């Protein structure tokens, strides 16, 4: 496929994120991915989900896969920023993107179905067919991508097809549609075992979509400044 930016676009105003976007600090990438849209082509349909929740991971901290060492399965984590790293979690597929520096990456934790002239209601219907509820019925739109494995299931993303691959603007890419969260929630990551840097505030949530992420950081009992921090559009992330 040609590397010419015009010839490689799936439609004229598509804005695929370049590798340079990903080849930066994982915390920065994780935060700036909020509002971007994952697009995956299935036949003549472009399935799409807005990224609403991410988690950053680093080689040197104990919560990351990379901290366990290099293996052939984990090789995408050690490649340049912009490689796709997929693995199985709780019986489902999970989507990650490598970031700047060997072993650093961002996990796409949750999304929300995105509708526009490219990804229309037919695409949404396909996503609901791919990820029905436990009774086989169409899953509620707000819960369709509310978790890392639910997201991949609804988007039709599979480990064997995409692990260690690069983005392909004709098949799978992250689109900059011009959306920016007005407020971002920063909190500790989910599901990290005790003693493996579970306290690190490397999780980012688009505050407007907090109710649709894996676990609502604004739920009853959570206290600002203790359990999470609210960041404005220009505020620096916490270290």
UniProtKB/Swiss-Prot annotation:
Gene3D superfamilies: Methylpurine-DNA glycosylase (MPG). Pfam families: Pur_DNA_glyco (PF02245). GO terms for biological process: base-excision repair. CDD domains: AAG (cd00540). One of its GO terms (molecular function) is alkylbase DNA N-glycosylase activity. Belongs to the DNA glycosylase MPG family. NCBIfam families: PRK00802.1-5. This is Putative 3-methyladenine DNA glycosylase.
